[in-house]
Design a protein with these regions (language model features):
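Short aromatic-glycine-enriched beta-strand elements
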Residues: 366-372
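Penicillin-recognizing serine hydrolase domain
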Residues: 399-433, 437, 492-638
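N-terminal Sec-pathway targeting helices
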Residues: 10-32
Length: 638
């Protein structure tokens, strides 16, 4: 991350609660370390040092410090954990507000696990730490001296979310995990030794002006007094600029990092045959690594927080998961449900907000956590395993649609669609249950006469804006365009609305993307089946047109001449009300494009469907496909 490189310019004299139960005043001393060893020049920046009372011991000036700092045990990482691709990870909805408001991208990085239910609450791990949403009544020990998972955690009063840096737990355990890369010469056990109180340094002494060439600046953070004088730690200016940047520490460096617990410790790490020189420094709420072999966008050495999230999981293993059978959960994005975790065969493909039910058992694999789940739709049900990282136990907002592949509705229908390849696409919206089923939903297809629907809606929106109803001639054009699919009538109305630009403006105004009107021929406009379903959904839900014009549009689409009905119209269940429009035309390649779209209502059940085909040798081939898909959906959803 790029940060501005600046010296501290303000005196901060707020009280700070120390890790050993004493209040330390924080004083900053800017020092210049010259090329002569141990010779420095001090420049106090108007700071005030607050008294520490009786803390004067010379070797370990702060007795009662974290007892684990003097420990000798080490912990060898045994859990195999692979960090997922950031594109496949999601910040759980329960943490999104905190993550956005608290600079989560900088302070925490990407999610590397899902938010999982534990004994104490919901826990999600990130690149640089973790977030905890405690259960009511849970006892959470945030004291830095605890050396546990929650040590040095920072609670947000607005959301009750606790940010966990994890570094304290890794230091306390003496994790043998390498710091700053798999081949690093430094481990957390080494950092623990470097963080002991006897590593505090005295305030650097003054040297003559003759040694003032080629200085490198440091900031001295005062911790207290010993018999040798003021003691604390030196922070290199590059690291100081990083931790004090508003991007890195939106709540201020004292809150987001706290005082240093060590000096900046040199290390090396080999990457792709190149030796990288590192500086690692421990703070109360984070560990910072400067890699002098990499640069940021300003060309300066790259500085980041340490990847404590993955290091914690590899050292301690995953947290104990507490999932109750029959607990509802929802998909966060596209993911499969497999027969077995990791390597199983896909059973269904689910998408955002798709509802699932936990079976109660879980499985940790190298790729992460998997939940055993079951699903049920109008046409299918089953059980399998889904990656927990792509799920949430937080219900989506009311009215949010759910998404899935056709295999979640009917494996047989999904298999049929797959056999048609990329020249076929289908989208169904089960309005009654708020569920989309899709196959090749974003493919672009020639609209043919289905373009007459957006022409009609654009025209009626225009007359509404003009404060009038269609005149007799316009009503004739509308009727023959929709009911008889008359192309001359469609051309007349297309010209009257202003052609392709006007239709594009209408579609943009109602938020429908994916339909591209063709200025040279409306019939060769293109659409995605999803866009067509979304446009029909807006008509069905009254999001376009006033009530009178909406009734007119439905009346026209419900009275299509029999010779213009196939697909939706030919296969609708008995007693269904169908508002529809089909289309077919030879494409530029002289192969047929054919489609069928409509709104079908049977009693209390309503679904909206669009099936598009193209590059078919015979028109009958397109008819057969639309009949098969529309008929199968009608049997499943009506």
């Amino acid at each position: 991350m790029a940060t501005s490189k600046k010296a501290p310019t303000a005196v901060e004299t707020r009280w700070w609660r120390g890790t050993w139960g004493r209040r330390f005043g924080v004083a900053f001393v800017l020092t210049c370390l010259w090329s002569v060893p141990l010779l420095t020049v001090n420049a106090w920046i108007g700071a005030h040092a607050y008294s520490l009372g009786n803390a004067h011991a010379t070797s370990t000036p702060f007795t009662g410090a974290k007892s684990w700092l003097s420990g000798a045990r080490t912990t060898t990482p045994t859990f195999s954990f692979t960090v997922p691709d950031a594109r496949q990870s999601y910040v759980d909805p329960m943490f999104k507000a905190y993550y956005s408001a608290s600079g989560g991208a900088q302070a925490l990085g990407s999610a590397i696990t899902p938010a999982v239910p534990t004994r104490d609450g919901w826990l999600q791990f990130f690149t640089y730490g973790a977030l905890l949403l405690p259960k009511a009544g849970a006892t959470i020990n945030l004291a830095p001296s605890s050396g546990g998972l929650y040590a040095a955690g920072l609670r947000d009063d607005k959301t009750n979310v606790i940010r966990l840096p994890l570094g304290e737990a890794l230091l306390a355990s003496g994790s043998a995990s390498p710091v700053g890369g798999d081949t690093s010469t430094l481990t957390y056990a080494d950092l623990r030794v470097a963080s002991r109180p006897n590593t505090l340094v005295t305030n650097p002494v003054t040297v003559s002006a003759a040694n003032q060439q080629g200085a490198q600046s440091n900031v001295f953070i005062y911790e207290g007094q010993s018999s040798a004088g003021a003691v604390g730690h030196l922070v290199p200016m590059d690291i100081w600029s990083y931790i004090t940047s508003a991007d890195t520490s939106p709540d201020g460096w004292q809150t987001d990092f706290g005082n240093p617990m060590s000096e900046a410790i040199p290390a090396t790490s080999s990457r792709q045959g190149t030796v990288h020189h590192l500086l690692v420094q421990v703070f109360w709420r984070g560990i910072v690594v400067e890699d002098r072999g990499l640069t940021d966008s300003d060309g300066d050495p790259l500085i980041t927080r340490l990847n404590t999230g993955a290091d914690y999981l590899r050292t301690f293993g995953p947290p104990a998961i507490s999932v109750t059978s029959q607990t509802p959960l929802w998909a966060l994005g596209d993911s499969p449900v497999l027969t077995t975790p990791d390597t199983g065969s896909p059973l269904v493909h689910i998408g955002q907000n798709f509802p699932l039910t936990a079976k109660g058992d879980v499985s940790w694999t190298k790729s992460g956590l998997w939940y055993h789940v079951q699903w049920k739709t109008r046409g299918s049900h089953g059980e399998g395993w889904t990656p927990a990282l792509a799920t949430t136990f937080t219900a989506p907002p009311a009215g949010s649609p759910a998404w899935a592949g056709f295999d979640a509705l009917s494996p047989d229908l999904a298999s049929y669609l797959n056999s048609q390849g990329g020249n076929t696409s289908a989208v169904v919206y089960d309005v009654t249950r708020g569920q989309y089923y899709t196959y090749n939903a974003s493919g672009q297809f020639i609209m043919a006469s289905s373009a007459k629907v957006p022409i009609m809606l654009t025209f009626l929106t225009m007359t509404e804006a003009q404060g009038r109803e269609p005149n007799d001639n316009e009503m004739y054009l509308l009727t023959t365009m929709i009911e008889n699919s008359d192309n001359d009538s469609a051309q007349a109305l297309f010209d009257e609305i202003g052609g392709a630009p006007a239709m594009s403006n209408f579609l943009s105004s109602v938020g429908v993307n994916g339909i591209a009107p063709d200025p040279d021929g409306w019939g060769y406009s293109t659409t995605t089946p999803l866009a067509m379903v979304q446009l029909l959904t807006m008509l069905h839900k009254g999001k376009v047109l006033n009530a009178q014009d909406r009734a007119l549009a439905f009346n026209l689409m419900e009275n299509i001449e029999p010779d213009q009905q196939t697909g939706v119209g030919d296969t609708a269940p008995n007693g269904a009300t169908v508002a529809m429009k089909d289309g077919w035309v030879p494409g530029p390649d002289n192969l047929w494009a054919m489609n069928s779209s409509g709104i079908v209502t049977v009693g209390s059940e309503t679904y909206i469907i669009a099936v598009y085909t193209q590059h078919e040798n015979e028109l009958q081939d397109g008819w057969n496909i639309t009949d098969h898909v529309c008929g199968a959906v009608g049997q499943l959803l009506a």
